Amino acid sequence: MRAEGDGGLERFCSPGKGRGLRALQPFQVGDLLFSCPAYAYVLTVSERGNHCEFCFARKEGLSKCGRCKQAFYCNVECQREDWPMHKLECSPMVVFGENWNPSETVRLTARILAKQKIHPERTPSEKLLAVKEFESHLDKLDNEKRDLIQSDIAALHHFYSKHLEFPDNDSLVVLFAQVNCNGFTIEDEELSHLGSAIFPDVALMNHSCCPNVIVTYKGTLAEVRAVQEIHPGEEVFTSYIDLLYPTEDRNDRLRDSYFFTCECQECTTKDKDKAKVEIRKLNDPPKAETIRDMVRYARNVIEEFRRAKHYKSPSELLEICELSQEKMSCVFEDSNVYMLHMMYQAMGVCLYMQDWEGALRYGQKIIQPYSKHYPLYSLNVASMWLKLGRLYMGLENKAAGERALKKAIAIMEVAHGKDHPYISEIKQEIESH
C-alpha cells in the first residue's frame, strides 16, 4: 500500500535517510502541502493568562480555572475540551504549590501517555506516521542523555502518579528519547516560545539546510508550506535547526540533537560559510590561527551566555554581550554570524529592559546580514522585520515602521499563508497608527 496523506504526498524510503515524505504533484511557493493537528501539546508556563490552554488563542480577558487558578481559557467549551489533559495537573498544582515544577518535556510526555490511553487507535495527526513508529536513537544516547531521561522519568512519577498509569522504565526511556527527537516547539510571530507539541506527520519530513518547506502554527495546528518550487517525485525537506550558523556548527547541533550529519548542497559546498564567518578587512590580515581561536572563543561565549541567562541579571547579561562583541570585532566583521548572535541576544535583553532605542539600534545592525545569511523566506528574518517595525511604531517613526512591517508581511504571506490571523493583526497595527 502506498501511504498517502493529504493528496499529493506520500511516505517513502529516502536513500540514506530512512523514512521521508515525497511530493506526487507540483507545489508552487506559498502552497500549503498539508496541515497536521497536534497529537499532544502543552502551553508553556510563562504564557499562562496570555493564551488559551486549549486552543492557544491569544486574547485579553481569558477565564481562569476555578480549581487551580493557573490555567486560562477562552470559554467553557475550551475548558471542557481541555479537561482530560488539564486534570493531570489541576489538583497536583494546588497540592505541590510552589514545588510544582516539571519540565515542559515531562508535561508533554504525561499528555502523550494520557492520549494513548484515551485514544489508542490512530488519530488524524498520524495519517502517514504513527507516534509508536517514532525513531528514538536509543543506541546513540550517551550517559549524560540517559541520566537526563532518568531524571525526567523520576519527575513524571513524582508529579503525575495520581492520574496516570505508567509503562515500565524501559518503555519510558524509549518514549522520552522519541519526544526529544520528534518534539516541536510552537512559537509566535516573533519566534517567542509558546509551548511544545507532537506532530507525527510533520516529524516524517527529513532535514535539509536548504529546505523546500517551512512549518508554521495556527493555534495548535501545524501547517507546512512550500518555500521553493517542488516537482513531483522530489523529497520534501524542512529544517530542524537555526540556519544562521556555518556548516560545522550546524552539523554539531544536528549530531547532538538528532544523531546525523547533513549532506545537503549547503553542507557539501559550504558556499555561505565564508560570508558567515566574515573577517575584518585589515592592512595586516589576521592569521589562520587567530581566526580559529576567535571562532573557539565565540562558540564558548555563546554557550556561556546561554547558561548565564538562567541566573545573571539583565545588566550583567548585556555586559557579556558588549564585551564579547568588542573582543570579536578585532577579527570579525559586524556581519559575522557570531557577532550577530551576540547582537541578537543584546537586543533581547534591551527589549526585556524596555530600552526601546537600544533594541532598535541592535535590530538595525542585524537585519541586512540576516537577510543575506538566511534563506529567502525565513521566519527569523520576518520576525526581525516585525520587531523593528513595532519598535519604530512605538518610537513614533510611522514611515519606517510601516516599511518594516510590510517586509515582514511579504515573507509571512508565503510562510504562514495570506489568511493567517497574525497577518491580519499586523495589518491592523499599520492601520491603527
Swiss-Prot record:
Matches recorded under Gene3D superfamilies: 1.10.220.160, 1.25.40.970, 6.10.140.2220, SET domain, Tetratricopeptide repeat domain
Record: residues binding Zn(2+) 2: C65, C68, H86, C90
One term under GO cellular component: cytoplasm
Annotated positions binding S-adenosyl-L-methionine: K17, G18, R19, H137, N206, H207, Y258, F259, F260
Residue ranges annotated for the SET domain, each copy included: 7-241
Location of this chain's protein in the cell: Cytoplasm, Cytosol; Nucleus
EC primary class: transferase
Statement: the UniProt record of this protein carries the keyword Transferase: yes
Protein keywords: Chromatin regulator, Cytoplasm, Metal-binding, Methyltransferase, Nucleus, S-adenosyl-L-methionine, Transcription, Transcription regulation, Transferase, Zinc, Zinc-finger
Reactions accelerated catalytically: L-lysyl(4)-[histone H3] + 3 S-adenosyl-L-methionine = N(6),N(6),N(6)-trimethyl-L-lysyl(4)-[histone H3] + 3 S-adenosyl-L-homocysteine + 3 H(+); L-lysyl-[protein] + S-adenosyl-L-methionine = N(6)-methyl-L-lysyl-[protein] + S-adenosyl-L-homocysteine + H(+)
One GO MF term attached to the UniProt entry: RNA polymerase II complex binding
GO biological process: negative regulation of cell population proliferation; negative regulation of transcription by RNA polymerase II; peptidyl-lysine dimethylation; peptidyl-lysine monomethylation; regulation of DNA damage response, signal transduction by p53 class mediator
ZnF region ranges: MYND-type: 52-90
Residue sites binding Zn(2+) 1 per the record: C52, C55, C74, C78
Alphabetical list of SUPFAM superfamilies matching this protein: SET domain, TPR-like
Family: Belongs to the class V-like SAM-binding methyltransferase superfamily.
Assembly and oligomerization: Interacts with RNA polymerase II and HELZ. Interacts with SIN3A and HDAC1. Interacts (via MYND-type zinc finger) with EPB41L3. Interacts (via SET domain) with p53/TP53. Interacts with RB1 and HSP90AA1.
PANTHER family: HISTONE-LYSINE N-METHYLTRANSFERASE SMYD (PTHR12197), N-LYSINE METHYLTRANSFERASE SMYD2 (PTHR12197:SF193)
Name by which UniProt lists this protein: N-lysine methyltransferase SMYD2
Species whose genome carries this gene: Bos taurus (Bovine)
Lineage: Eukaryota, Metazoa, Chordata, Craniata, Vertebrata
